[in-house]
Amino acid sequence: MSDKSESYKVITDNRQARYLYEILETFEAGIQLTGTEVKSIRAGKVNLQDGYALLRDGEIWLINAHISPYNASGQYFNHEPRRTRKLLLHRQEIRKLIGKVEQQGLTLVPLKMYLKRGWVKVSIALGKGKKLHDKRESLKRRQDQRDMQRAMKNY
């Protein structure tokens, strides 16, 4: 029997977030979902590209993340694809995030969604928006790393 305590299956990854934001700190959050949303997530029909998280009334909400409607069920019991979903974190983590977002002007961005021990989890990050020259600089740095690796491989 396999050890499921540390295993997790990544459903979707928001690669654009790492390009647009400088990631300072990451958190693991649970997410409040309906049954058809969980079935769609298990099928891999999720998009976090336009998603972000907001603080409202001491709670954290995931906004604009697209979970496609589940095809096997009828339209009557299906969910709204872009509805606002509550993220579940410990109270002290929420207090820490409130302080950093309000005082330092940081943004909460979803990085990836995955299954951990049968539960759907979202990895959210505190991010600082990159300027255009920062994006170019990171691309240049990545290209230089590739060139150095190629040179090392040849010699």
From Swiss-Prot:
GO terms for biological process: trans-translation. InterPro entries: SmpB (IPR023620), SsrA-bd_prot (IPR000037), SsrA-bd_prot_CS (IPR020081). GO terms for cellular component: cytosol. Its main location: cytoplasm. Keywords: Cytoplasm, RNA-binding. It comes from the Bacteria. It is found in: Cytoplasm. SUPFAM superfamilies: Small protein B (SmpB). Pfam families: SmpB. GO terms for molecular function: RNA binding. Belongs to the SmpB family. Required for rescue of stalled ribosomes mediated by trans-translation. Binds to transfer-messenger RNA (tmRNA), required for stable association of tmRNA with ribosomes. tmRNA and SmpB together mimic tRNA shape, replacing the anticodon stem-loop with SmpB. tmRNA is encoded by the ssrA gene; the 2 termini fold to resemble tRNA(Ala) and it encodes a 'tag peptide', a short internal open reading frame. During trans-translation Ala-aminoacylated tmRNA acts like a tRNA, entering the A-site of stalled ribosomes, displacing the stalled mRNA. This is SsrA-binding protein. The lineage of its organism: Bacteria, Bacillati, Cyanobacteriota, Cyanophyceae, Nostocales. The gene is smpB.
